[in-house]
From Swiss-Prot:
PANTHER family: ANAEROBIC NITRIC OXIDE REDUCTASE TRANSCRIPTION REGULATOR NORR, TRANSCRIPTIONAL REGULATORY PROTEIN. CDD domains: AAA. Keywords: ATP-binding, DNA-binding, Nucleotide-binding, Phosphoprotein, Transcription, Transcription regulation. GO terms for molecular function: ATP binding; ATP hydrolysis activity; DNA binding; DNA-binding transcription factor activity. Pfam families: GAF (PF01590), Sigma54_activat (PF00158). ATP binds at residues 215-222, 278-287. Residues 187-416 form the Sigma-54 factor interaction domain. Residues 481-500 bind DNA. InterPro entries: AAA+_ATPase, GAF, GAF-like_dom_sf, Homeodomain-like_sf, NorR, P-loop_NTPase, Sigma_54_int, Sigma_54_int_dom_ATP-bd_1. Gene3D superfamilies: 1.10.8.60, 3.30.450.40, Homeodomain-like (1.10.10.60), P-loop containing nucleotide triphosphate hydrolases (3.40.50.300). GO terms for biological process: phosphorelay signal transduction system. This is Anaerobic nitric oxide reductase transcription regulator NorR. It comes from Salmonella agona (strain SL483). The modification 4-aspartylphosphate is found at residue 57.
Length: 506
């Protein structure tokens, strides 16, 4: 056997050294890559007929954002169906899911691959994949040795999943409650900002509190609402969605509370509103700041007393609904301006959440790009869609004013452009395929930084100086607001508010 007792003991010890599951997983695959002298290793979690990367070593960073469906990846399907070690020869007809995703080897095909399915009892919970550019790399290791590695990895993953399930079910000591754990909701990201958001979602999901979700347009507030609902005791009941900004004033009340036959012209039958549809479930009110003051008052009554009245009906109906609301506005400012009721604001914001803009999420941009690349690959029937190193740098240097939604559209557009200029079913996205509307701003000359403005009064001079300071900080930090705030030694939220007041942003 090529594995000594010391090597196996070392792997087991590494699994105990990490502070958290993610650290342990990373130590595991890094150690395996070193022991097996292979080019890449990955630990994948199995869920809903797809493999979700948990930790990687030797692979492009965007792999962590990809979701590998069994239907789209025959090698992974073979691993999922097998109950034992799977070896793919160098001349295998099945494409490797990591072709083009090993840094420095983007144009080469992976030659050797070993897949180790991971089980908890009889249930498939994940897989280990090992890849090498040398065809004979894994021949010196027997199946028995690889099974031992798989057993160690399966034990670590099984324990992590069990703890995650217990935490999401509030069944750890000192808590109670039984309901489904949070499932995959495509909330992709490992940045500190997203890690904190996920923790806050787990905290509030198991309660029955109303939640106000804030954040810029395109940040993914609806995904946050879905994650909260899926992690709650109401998950077995419906999550009903309503975009308040798309509601004409004439039908808004009927959409929310329903109507009876004959209540108004065109009301030819009784109709349930969104609150009735969401009874015993969750109602997600997107763009809550767009509701009129009159409707805000009626919404407040529902939150206070739990009853509604259909339009044209004198009777009240009891409903049990949890309300999640989202807005891209600063509702505190809306309250001060008299456009939003203070009492409703306080009812909704029992547990406020803020979804960070993409420009403050660092390398999450690359993970999300990988996710969208995989989506495009499946949708267009391509064998692979990968990002070149220049494309990754280009995406990281862009400010993403449209956030995740803009990134999604940019990836889809780039794939179409790249496909049109390259024959075959393989697409490599280069920087020139991204026609981004806002280029990285060059740094201004140093001597202009403290140039004094010429204005009539102190207030105007101060505001002009503040504008110039903010513009220069943004230019020097690639239009990254968080980095600019740090450079100016101020809070990023305060910087956004000041920039808005000075007319530097909408």
């Amino acid at each position: 056997m090529s594995f000594s007792v010391e090597v196996l003991a070392g792997i087991a010890i590494e699994l105990q050294r990490g502070i958290g599951h993610q650290d342990r997983f990373q130590r595991l695959i890094t150690t395996l890559r070193q022991v097996l002298a292979c080019d890449a290793s990955a630990l994948l979690r199995y869920e809903s007929r797809q493999f979700i990367p948990l930790a990687i070593d030797g692979l492009a960073q965007d792999v962590l954002g990809r979701r590998f469906t069994l239907e789209g990846h025959p090698r992974l399907e073979a691993i999922a169906r097998a109950g034992d070690v799977v070896r793919f020869p160098a001349d295998s007809d099945l494409p490797d899911p990591y072709d083009g995703l090993i840094p420095g080897q983007e144009s080469l095909k992976v030659h050797a691959c070993v897949g180790l399915p991971l089980f908890a009892g009889q249930n498939l919970i994940g897989a280990l994949t090992l890849d090498a550019m040398t065809p004979e790399q894994f021949e010196v290791f027997s199946d028995e040795e690889l099974r031992l590695v798989a057993a160690l990895a399966a034990g670590a993953l099984s324990n992590a999943l069990l703890i995650e399930q217990l935490e999401s079910q509030n069944m750890l000591p000192g808590s109670s409650g039984v309901f489904e754990p949070i499932k995959e909701t495509h909330m992709i990201g490992l940045s500190p900002a997203m890690t904190q958001l996920k923790k806050e979602i787990e905290i509030v999901a198991g309660s029955d509190l109303n939640v106000l979700i804030g954040g810029e347009t395109g940040t993914g507030k609806e995904l946050v609402a879905k994650a909260i609902h899926q992690g709650s005791p109401r998950a077995v009941n419906p999550l009903v969605y309503l975009n308040c900004a798309a509601l004409p004033e004439s039908v808004a009340e009927s959409e929310l509370f329903g109507h009876v036959k004959g209540a108004f012209t065109g009301a030819i039958s009784n109709r349930s509103g969104k609150f009735e549809m969401a009874d015993n479930g969750t109602l997600f009110l997107d763009e809550i700041g767009e509701l009129s003051l009159a409707l805000q008052a009626k919404l407040l009554r529902v939150l206070q007393y739990g009853d509604i009245q259909r339009v044209g009906d004198d009777r009240s109906l009891r409903v049990d609904v949890r309300v999640l609301a989202a807005t891209n506005r600063d509702l505190r400012e809306e309250v001060l301006a008299g456009r939003f009721r203070a009492d409703l604001f306080h009812r909704l914001s029992v547990f406020p959440l803020f979804v960070p803009p993409l420009r403050e999420r660092g390398d999450d941009v690359v993970l999300l790009a990988g996710y969208f690349c995989e989506q495009c690959r499946l949708r267009l029937g391509l064998s692979r869609v990968v990002l070149s190193p220049d494309a990754r740098r280009h995406l990281l240097n862009y400010g993403w004013p449209g956030n995740v939604r803009e990134l999604e559209h940019a990836i889809h557009r780039a794939v179409v452009l790249a496909r049109a200029t390259r024959a075959g079913d393989e697409v490599i996205l280069e920087a020139q395929h991204f026609a981004l509307s806002e280029d990285v701003l060059p740094a201004p000359p140093a001597e202009s930084f403290l140039a004094l403005p010429t204005c009539r009064n102190l207030r105007e001079s101060t505001e002009n100086f503040q504008r110039e300071m903010i513009r220069q900080a943004l230019a020097q930090n690639n239009h990254n607001w968080a980095a600019s705030a740090r450079a100016l030694e101020t809070d990023v939220a305060n910087l956004h508010r000041l920039a808005k007041r000075l007319g530097l942003k909408d």
